[in-house]
Amino acid sequence: MKSINQIRKISIWIFIIPVVALNLCLLISVNHELFEGTIFQVGAIGKIGFTIPYVDGIVSISRTARTYPAYLIFKPAMIFTAILLIKYWIANNKLIVTVNGEDDKRKYFLIFGVGSALFLIAHSIFLGIKFDHDLYKFFRRFVILGFIIFEIVAQTLLVINIFKVKEKMERLINKKILILKIILVIILIITALVAIPFLSSSGYPRFKHALEWNYFIGVVFFYLLSFLFWKKVLS
């Protein structure tokens, strides 16, 4: 099936692009002195010392990504990733419908998947825009929370749909990777639920930052597993 090869190609780029962009922004912030006196001089907020935020949580993703010149990398990368996400969910919807031969052309994972991509686009556009108003601050939190919730729901529903039809596609899939995808989704859900009390409090900044970095990697790691899950179909 051509759609499987398409899904594989899209999946690997959905993993690579945000991971590379995110860590490039981190490297720019950590090595800000390299850009002193150039047109790419890092803004004051973006200047930080050596840190491994995945472990120490010293800095947030937003701080490394929202200042010049990091946002020149981060914003286009996230918007392009969102476009790929839309294509990914549409391709998966077509594949599941084809395998099942169903009349219902729209799966719920498609709605949540496309929704998560739209939230990501909105988050990328408004990142770094300063507007001191409570409603705007609420909107930003709502957008990032919407992306996370919609993305996790979409991933969960897709895994459920694939699990239901796995016997029909056993020659095209890697069942061990399917198990890993199920485990990953469960971990993401449990982590989100356990983290709610911490995220709703005003304390634990380093914990929140470290969780943010690692959770982001966990979310996009799903797409690396998607690439490995489908076996390449020879045309």
What are these regions (language model features)?
Residues L84-G115:
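Cytoplasmic juxtamembrane regions at transmembrane-helix boundaries
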Residues V97, I125-H133, L193-Y204:
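Juxtamembrane "helix-exit" motif on the non-cytosolic side of transmembrane helices
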Residues L157-S235:
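Terminal transmembrane helical module of multi-pass membrane proteins
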